[in-house]
Amino acid sequence: MNADPPARVDAERNRRLLLDSAAAALASDPDATLGDVARRAGLVRATLYRHFSSRESLLEALRDDAVECANDVVAGSRVAEDSALEALRRVVTGIVSLGARFRPLLLEGATQDPEFLRKREQAFMPVVMIVRRGQQSGEIRGDVSVRWIVTALMALLAAAVRMDADLSEEDAVELVFGTLALGIQGTHSP
């Protein structure tokens, strides 16, 4: 027996559809209106307003959703397996695949929101562990702080997301990872 009543399932499905549609609409047109988002989702504006009372509440939900997606990607990147550099490449590949979801947030200034930054930092804690592991094994330079490496990674990812239209996903992964790896590879890198 399903514990969620059909109305609840519909509401969750509509919310997910609205978030996905908002990310896509705002990625292609940062000035997209709530009406544009509703149309893209194939829903009426009243449905959108039942979930999000304003553009800001929709953007806040998009920020939360983006961090949740990043959490899922990092968790699914098998961060404890293989070499630290290979684990970092998997993280980069996963985050780059979310580019369209993050682009509107960068353009809207989400990176200035302290709550978003705190949640993003939590999402990247496994990356801190990867870097530390790499430093201990000699794969990653020990003379560069973990904080610097993780901050540089996030900046490179943000640059790739901003250039989304100019780069293929594969090229973005190679540029982000290649640039990072050139600066952090230790003497015992594979």
Regions inferred by a protein language model and the residue ranges of each:
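Amphipathic alpha-helical interaction segments
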Residues: 17, 36, 86-90, 94, ...
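Hydrophobic alpha-helical connector segments
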Residues: 61, 72-100, 112-115
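Short hydrophobic/aromatic patch on the recognition helix
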Residues: 42-52
